[in-house]
Amino acid sequence: YTKAEDASYQGTGYANTEGGGWLVHTQKNRGEFYQNFCLRLLETRNCVGWVHFEYNDGYDSNGKASNKGVVSIEYEPYTSFLSQMRQVNLAVHSLIDYYDTKSVQ
């Protein structure tokens, strides 16, 4: 997964130190990463599905926040991230058809 540097709580940026994953600049970049990741999964033609594991951002055991969710700690949606998730998720069946056709050629 990816975490964005622009995530914050009451004006203070998240530490984003919990867990693995990549760090990107913005929520839009998180969406681009998500789309690219999903496209590569579909292109392999052996993926049975995927899930975004975290609903909301959270804290680690030291009280430091990490940007893992589709909504903030205050349950505000990351609209630019979600719109890109929605775009690829709505197109998944046509993308599967595309990659299936491409592999036959």
Task: Give the location of each predicted region.
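Aromatic-rich peripheral "rim/lid" segments of glycoside hydrolase catalytic domains that contact
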Residues: 53-105
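Conserved, mostly hydrophobic/aromatic
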Residues: 50
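Acidic-histidine catalytic/liganding microenvironments
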Residues: 44
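Active-site clefts of carbohydrate-active enzymes
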Residues: 1-37, 53-57
